[in-house]
């Protein structure tokens, strides 16, 4: 195979993201990626240092994409409306980009925990969540992080159960999700009263 014209790091990462979304991040291999791109595996090393570097880049791309999605969802919204918009955006990201999402969950396990680019991307994804939580009366960074973890856990857990076929009873999962987010919002309000 001759070198493919137009092949660069961004093209390699985009193809890897598509492969990860089709299968699983864990199953992503440089051999499969090379086949997808129509190049020999050694050609990939002109663009990525190896599978670890590629997965780190997928974490970065995924965090940035998730952050943009959360920012769009939260724009102009506050309170319960903002919480639901964020949770739905998160749930949609899990469904639409499963491999890329998996890379965001594993971001710090895949590379250096002090990686400044990954840290900045995580912070950017967190900003719209913190803004909406502040509109719900959550104050102080520590409390906001606890609440953000709670909201993320709700969206992650629901979406992964849903994707695995875990909701077999004939009830609308969208309504279940809305009720769950409303219960979380109610909990935030009751926690505020106790503080």
What is each model feature region?
Residues 1-32, 36, 53-56:
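Basic, helix-initiating cap at the start of DNA-binding domains
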Residues 12-20, 62, 66, 90, ...:
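Short hydrophobic clusters on alpha-helical segments that form packing/core surfaces
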Residues 20, 54-62, 104, 118-121, ...:
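Alpha-helical DNA-contacting segments of helix-turn-helix folds
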Residues 38-48:
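Short hydrophobic/aromatic patch on the recognition helix
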Residues 71-100, 122-124, 144-151:
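Hydrophobic alpha-helical connector segments
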Residues 95-113, 160-168:
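Amphipathic alpha-helical segments used for helix-helix packing
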Residues 111-138, 145-150, 174-186:
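Amphipathic alpha-helical packing segments from all-alpha helical-bundle domains
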Residues 153-170, 184-194:
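Amphipathic C-terminal alpha-helical segment
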């Amino acid at each position: 195979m001759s070198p493919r014209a137009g092949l660069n790091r961004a093209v390699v990462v985009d193809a890897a993201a598509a492969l990860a979304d089709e299968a699983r991040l864990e199953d992503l291999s440089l051999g499969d990626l090379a086949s997808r791109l129509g190049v020999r595996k050694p050609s990939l090393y002109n663009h990525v240092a190896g599978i670890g570097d590629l997965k780190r880049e997928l974490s970065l791309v995924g965090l940035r994409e998730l952050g943009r999605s959360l920012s769009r969802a939260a724009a102009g919204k506050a309170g319960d409306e903002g919480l639901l918009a964020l949770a739905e955006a998160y749930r949609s990201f899990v469904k639409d980009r499963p491999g890329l999402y998996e890379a965001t969950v594993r971001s710090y396990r895949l590379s250096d925990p002090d990686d400044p680019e990954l840290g900045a991307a995580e912070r950017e994804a967190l900003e719209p969540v913190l803004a909406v939580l502040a509109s719900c009366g959550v104050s102080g960074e520590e409390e906001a992080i606890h609440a953000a973890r709670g909201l993320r856990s709700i969206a992650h857990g629901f979406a992964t159960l849903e994707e695995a076929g875990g909701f077999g009873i004939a009830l609308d999962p969208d309504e279940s999700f809305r009720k769950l987010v409303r219960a979380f919002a109610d909990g935030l309000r009751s926690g505020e009263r106790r503080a």
